[in-house]
Amino acid sequence: MSMLCYTLIIAFLIGIWAAPQSEDNVPLGSPATSDLSDTSCAQTHEGLKTSRNTDQRHPAPKKVDDQELGSVANIIVDPKLFQKRQFQSSRVLFSTQPPPLSRDEQSVEFLDNEDALNRNIQAKRQNHPVHDLGEHSVCDSISEWVTKTTATDIKGNTVTVEVDVNLNNEVYKQYFFETKCRNPNPVPSGCRGIDSRLWNSYCTTTQTFVKALTMEGNQASWRFIRIDTACVCVITKKTDNL
């Protein structure tokens, strides 16, 4: 009987010692810890996924350099660059609006000295009243404002010309006033008014260099480029009259 009592007491003590421990004292690697780790990992993964989706919906803004390189036609220019400009030409201008068809209009705002250009053109027209005196040009020419994307510089290299320039949060276009021949032979014999019995003649467009805003590497810079500026008559003496 006493043996039975001892057996029951020992079984009771073993049961107490083997009772489940509290969650606060759960050893590392237990199922409860695994559940917490899995939950934390799931939350972290969900956070990364949400962050990735947010980045896709709202991509990071491009750097200024990336924006300038990606859009060469609308590069942001430091106003100090225009202070360093030298050898300004009346044939190069920057305008927020298309320039007038005739250069004596004053409805467009230019960065260059528009008034001086207009006065110069008007003075030339007053000093040379071609239509009133019946005078004629040796060659017929046409003049107009144009934009350029490429041109030949003073070294003979092909360079990129700026079309749109962002200056003080305003977009200006770079225009060039070009003059070229309308027809190489205004009359069947060549140039008008040339004695075809003694001379061979034809009209040709000549060029000159003007300072323009171009791209050099990743930066804007001033360079001399060729543009059409005049139409002249070229004559050669006929060999059969020598």
Curated annotation (Swiss-Prot):
> Which compartments does it reside in?
Secreted
Cysteines joined through disulfide linkages: 139-203, 181-231, 191-233
Q: Which UniProt keywords apply?
A: Cleavage on pair of basic residues, Disulfide bond, Growth factor, Lipid-binding, Metalloenzyme inhibitor, Metalloprotease inhibitor, Protease inhibitor, Secreted, Signal, Toxin
Domain of life from the UniProt record = Eukaryota
Q: Tell whether Signal is among the UniProt keywords.
A: yes
In its UniProt record, which GO terms are filed under biological process?
A: cell surface receptor protein tyrosine kinase signaling pathway; modulation of chemical synaptic transmission; negative regulation of neuron apoptotic process; nerve development; nerve growth factor signaling pathway; neuron projection morphogenesis
Signal sequence segment: 1-18
Pfam families from the entry? NGF (PF00243)
Tissue expr: Expressed by the venom gland.
Concerning SUPFAM superfamilies, the annotation shows: Cystine-knot cytokines
Chain positions listed as propeptide in the UniProt record: 19-125
| A single MF term (Gene Ontology) | toxin activity
GO CC terms of this entry: axon; dendrite; extracellular space; synaptic vesicle
Q: What family name appears in the similarity comment? A: Belongs to the NGF-beta family.
- How does this chain assemble? Homodimer; non-covalently linked.
Protein's job: Nerve growth factor is important for the development and maintenance of the sympathetic and sensory nervous systems. It stimulates division and differentiation of sympathetic and embryonic sensory neurons as well as basal forebrain cholinergic neurons in the brain. Its relevance in the snake venom is not clear. However, it has been shown to inhibit metalloproteinase-dependent proteolysis of platelet glycoprotein Ib alpha, suggesting a metalloproteinase inhibition to prevent metalloprotease autodigestion and/or protection against prey proteases.
Q: Which PANTHER family match?
A: BETA-NERVE GROWTH FACTOR, NERVE GROWTH FACTOR NGF -RELATED
**Protein name in UniProt:** Venom nerve growth factor 1
